[in-house]
Regions:
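Cytosolic ligand/metal-binding cores
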Residues: 1, 5-8, 126-152, 246-320, ...
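An N-terminal JmjN-like helical accessory module and its immediate linker preceding a catalytic domain
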Residues: 1-63
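Flexible loop/turn segments at secondary-structure boundaries
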Residues: 11-14, 38-41, 97-101, 204-206, ...
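An anion-binding catalytic pocket shared by soluble metabolic enzymes
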Residues: 35, 40-50, 196-286, 301-307, ...
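Non-catalytic accessory segments adjacent to catalytic cores
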Residues: 70-204, 430-439
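A residue-level signal for conserved active-site and pocket-lining positions in enzyme catalytic cores
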Residues: 92, 124, 191, 245, ...
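A short glycine-rich, hydrophobically flanked beta-strand micro-motif that places a catalytic Asp/Glu
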Residues: 92-94, 196, 226-230, 372-380
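Conserved hydrophobic core element of enzyme catalytic domains
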Residues: 325-440
Length: 440
């Protein structure tokens, strides 16, 4: 069985963001994924895996094989177990289309691709001052070492940057958005569902320097996860406030619902006042409790009886310019299920869909005029030992050869007003725009 060549390096000092992002420079396919203390970077494609409702396609070099899907989670696990490579890590995305598949809805405008993954040719795994270099081919280890030496000489100082001004883009599609909010409120009042998150796509006037945007945005945020990935034609940078699902090698499942928000300013006294307000706002508390209850119900469907516990409840989490109420749940995955069953059960995050999920997902597909694609889906890693880590794709910036955009949304309930919800999305666009660096 094939193995990665590996080499550990201990640095004299921790790498800064500019150095770390520099390891990705000039690559066709890559994914940088920050998970707590570890930053993992997969570069180049050794194996490509595309998943739709109908089939799983595996590409290794020029060899292509396909597996018909009978039961998605079981079939995907079976395909991955057949990979002839030791201790691999897979990087990839789950599109919002997974939610429609999971709840038995036609893909509609979301398209057929559910997952896209790649197992990289080379990798860096960075943890503090320790760096692990990995390569399928021994001769590429020299390239990895050389690149690492180059970026270590590059201190954290930037050339003059041109920030993208939000300008008129914050008002993009104003009347459309107010109309769909009103439609959502009407459907909630008629009893179709309790809550739905409705979003609008906002095109940007300039192409972006995604490397500088990632560095600048990461400095301004305290995310649960961050990522910068380029896969095929799509490039995405994001600062995720929460994970949809985490599964460790011992089959422990975790999820981390956030609901309830206040601003986070530069004034500690103001922040303390807002935090206290958040902890005593009955509407925010009720909204959070409903989200935790739904997460618990979903966990119980895939975890062993009596193993699901709330390990943290209603803690205040700081995320850049906002603070949220956050809770954490843990359970033990049932013996006959795998990590993909856990992800599919918890996907999409209630934060980005609504309550009940199926009815909210159906409404999103019907009311919003454009497909979400990766927005409100997941960027993730998956290891050969079954470990999975899936970040929620919010607070993200997207770019292809044709366009650059952000997408913002708001949670709609029966008391929502179109004007207030539109203002909330304006605030989110303005907040994101402060982190964007235009391409020169």
């Amino acid at each position: 069985m094939k193995k990665y060549y590996e080499k550990y390096t201990h640095l004299s000092k921790k790498m800064d963001l500019n150095m770390i992002a520099g390891l990705c420079g000039g690559r066709k396919n890559f994914c940088l994924y920050e998970n707590g203390e570890e930053i993992a970077i997969g570069i180049g494609t050794y194996i490509d895996i595309y998943v739709s409702a109908a089939e799983i396609m595996i590409k290794t070099g020029k060899k292509v094989s396909k597996v018909e899907v009978q039961e998605l989670c079981t079939d995907l696990e079976r395909v991955l177990l057949q990979i002839e490579l030791e201790n691999w890590r897979m990087y990839g995305i789950a599109n919002f289309s997974l939610s429609r598949y999971t709840y038995g809805l036609e893909s509609g405008k979301e398209g057929e691709e559910i997952f896209h993954f790649f197992i990289p040719e080379t990798e860096y795994r960075i943890c503090g001052k320790d760096v692990l270099l990995r390569s399928i081919e021994q001769e590429k280890m020299v390239e990895l070492e050389k690149k690492l030496e180059e970026v270590l000489e590059n201190e954290d100082n930037f050339p003059e940057q041109e920030f993208l001004h939000s300008g008129d883009i914050i008002n993009y599609d104003e009347e459309y958005y107010k109309t769909i909010v009103a439609d959502g409120v009407d459907e909630i009042k008629s009893g179709k569902y309790q809550k739905v998150i409705l979003s609008r796509k906002v095109p940007l006037s300039n192409r972006l320097n995604m490397k500088e945007t990632y560095i600048n945005g990461r400095k301004a945020n305290t995310p649960a996860r961050s990522y910068w990935c380029k896969m095929g034609t799509l490039e995405v940078v994001g600062f995720s406030p929460e994970t949809v699902a985490e599964v460790d090698r011992d089959k422990n499942v975790y999820t981390f619902p956030l609901a309830g928000t206040r601003a986070l300013t530069k004034d500690p006294d103001v922040n303390k006042k807002l935090k206290n307000e958040l902890l005593h706002d009955t509407k925010e508390i009720a909204e959070h409790a409903v989200s935790v209850k739904l997460a618990e119900e979903e966990m119980k469907q895939v975890c062993e009886e009596d193993s699901v516990v709330v390990t943290e409840f209603m803690s205040v989490m700081e995320r850049g310019t906002v603070q949220h109420l956050g809770s954490r749940l843990r359970g033990k995955l049932k013996a006959d299920l795998n990590s993909w069953h856990a992800l599919c059960k918890l996907f999409p995050a209630v934060t980005a869909s609504g309550i009940p999920k199926k009815e909210a997902i159906e409404a999103i597909g019907r009311i919003e005029k454009e497909p979400r694609g990766l927005y409100s889906g997941s960027v993730m890693t998956y290891d050969s030992d079954g470990s999975l880590d899936a970040a929620l794709v919010l607070r993200s910036i997207f770019q292809t050869d044709e366009e650059s955009w952000v997408r913002v949304g708001a949670g709609i309930v029966d008391m929502s007003g179109p004007e207030r919800e539109f203002i909330e999305t304006q605030e989110k666009v303005s907040s994101i725009a402060k982190q964007l660096i235009a391409e020169k």
